[in-house]
């Protein structure tokens, strides 16, 4: 753990140097950042599009050390509309020392004076991976090795939700999820796994469903106050190309409270997922992703149902003088969080709970949009994440 914390601190320092373009003095660094901030603020105030590139290392148990290239593209679907939030499309592509090649795009687009909202994600992974089987006990007790868990996975997923505001803060919409997994170099233990034997090594899924949402957050990407309650249901197997037929239900509750001043926020989230039917081993409910219990191996804990609870405190440091937007808090901050989660074959029978905690550093690259550096600790594992916007 000490090595992980040391690595986290070293990378954080390198990130600051990269953002400052390694000028010769602290004074020049501050001037450069102020000029960049002024240019970005001017573009944002005029409703113009902006682009922020980055290159940075990250570390997770499933990918090992990875070098990632990416960027954040923001824009207004209708410049000059003060009611409308800025749309954002962060993306990244990374290659790791264990041969993983991962790419992702996550979009939040606001239209029609914020009455129509589109969220979309695309993932593409070609990587050595591990499969422990289904259930908490397997994830905990089966040792990770080439002969017990290792295999190679090619995975693609595209999903979106589009919702329309029918009443103030109340949205109704549809969602779609399409994914496919191709596994190879499977070990003997995995070949004998009943779930793997049932669904095989080439799995395709396509689902459609409904979304019901209450959203009073002041800014969805980085809320200071407000509540999100979202209920989504997805039915898979409608299309002939789908491997199996099943249903998935999700409930996502988030709340944000400003503490004393803006930039000091207490946020918490409760999310659960329930599946029913012929659910493939690739699409079981999971905890331990970069967006919930940060610090675990993605995919180690999976079952028909999952639940997790997170509480996170976010703080942006103050300024001596207000910036161009008249704000007294600066572009740097930190977060601390703690949480727990569980997986189970039957919803409500959550017997075993996974602990989680972590710390993070934030760099505001434009108004209310942060570069996220997180170090998470789980039960016997740690992970280091470099991404845009908050985990929730």
Where are these regions (language model features)?
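Bacterial Sec-dependent N-terminal signal peptides
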Residues: 1-25
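Short loop/turn motifs that connect adjacent beta-strands in outer-membrane beta-barrel proteins
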Residues: 37-49, 77-86, 112-117, 169, ...
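Gram-negative/organellar outer-membrane beta-barrel architecture
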Residues: 43-52, 58-200, 204, 370, ...
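Hydrophobic, lipid-facing positions within transmembrane beta-strands of outer-membrane proteins
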Residues: 51-53, 67-69, 101-105, 154-160, ...
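Membrane-embedded beta-strand positions of outer-membrane beta-barrel proteins
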Residues: 53-55, 89-93, 118-122, 172-174, ...
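Sequence/structural signature of outer-membrane beta-barrel proteins
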Residues: 74-78, 92-100, 125-129, 179-183, ...
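Extracellular loop and loop/strand-boundary signature of outer-membrane beta-barrel proteins
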Residues: 92, 143-148, 192-199, 235-241, ...
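C-terminal outer-membrane beta-barrel translocator/porin domains of Gram-negative envelope proteins
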Residues: 217-327
């Amino acid at each position: 753990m000490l090595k992980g914390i040391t690595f986290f601190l070293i990378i954080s320092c390198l990130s600051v140097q990269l953002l400052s373009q390694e000028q010769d003095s602290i004074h020049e660094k501050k001037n450069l950042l102020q000029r960049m901030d002024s240019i970005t603020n001017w573009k944002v105030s005029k409703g113009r599009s902006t682009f922020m590139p980055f290159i940075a290392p990250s570390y997770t148990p499933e990918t090992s050390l990875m070098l990632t290239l990416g960027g954040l593209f923001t824009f207004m679907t209708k410049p000059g509309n003060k009611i409308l939030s800025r749309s954002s499309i962060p993306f990244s592509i990374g290659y790791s020392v264990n041969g993983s090649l991962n790419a992702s795009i996550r979009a939040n687009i606001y239209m029609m004076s914020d009455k129509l909202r589109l969220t979309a994600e695309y993932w593409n992974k070609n990587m050595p991976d591990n499969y422990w089987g289904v259930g908490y006990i397997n994830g905990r007790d089966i040792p990770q090795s080439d002969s017990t868990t290792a295999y190679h996975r090619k995975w693609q997923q595209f999903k979106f939700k589009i919702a329309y505001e029918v009443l103030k803060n109340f949205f109704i919409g549809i969602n779609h999820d399409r994914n496919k997994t191709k596994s190879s170099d499977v070990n003997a233990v995995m070949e004998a796994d009943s779930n793997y034997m049932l669904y095989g090594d080439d799995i395709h899924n396509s689902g459609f469903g409904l979304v019901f949402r209450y959203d009073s957050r002041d800014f969805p990407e980085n809320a200071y106050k407000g509540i999100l309650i979202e209920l989504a249901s997805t039915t898979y197997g409608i299309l002939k190309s789908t491997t199996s037929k099943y249903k998935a239900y999700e409930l996502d509750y988030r709340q944000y409270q400003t503490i004393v001043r803006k930039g000091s926020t207490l946020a918490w989230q409760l999310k659960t997922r329930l599946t029913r039917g012929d659910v493939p081993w690739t699409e079981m409910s999971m905890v331990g992703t970069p967006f919930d219990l940060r610090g675990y191996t993605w995919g180690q804990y999976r079952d028909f149902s999952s639940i997790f609870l997170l509480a996170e405190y976010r703080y942006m440091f103050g300024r001596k003088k207000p910036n161009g937007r008249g704000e007294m808090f600066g572009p740097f901050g930190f977060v601390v969080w703690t949480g727990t989660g569980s997986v189970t074959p039957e919803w409500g029978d959550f017997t075993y709970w996974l602990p989680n905690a972590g710390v993070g550093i934030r760099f505001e690259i434009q108004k209310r949009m942060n570069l996220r550096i997180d170090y998470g600790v789980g039960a016997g594992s740690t992970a280091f994440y470099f991404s845009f916007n908050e985990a929730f």
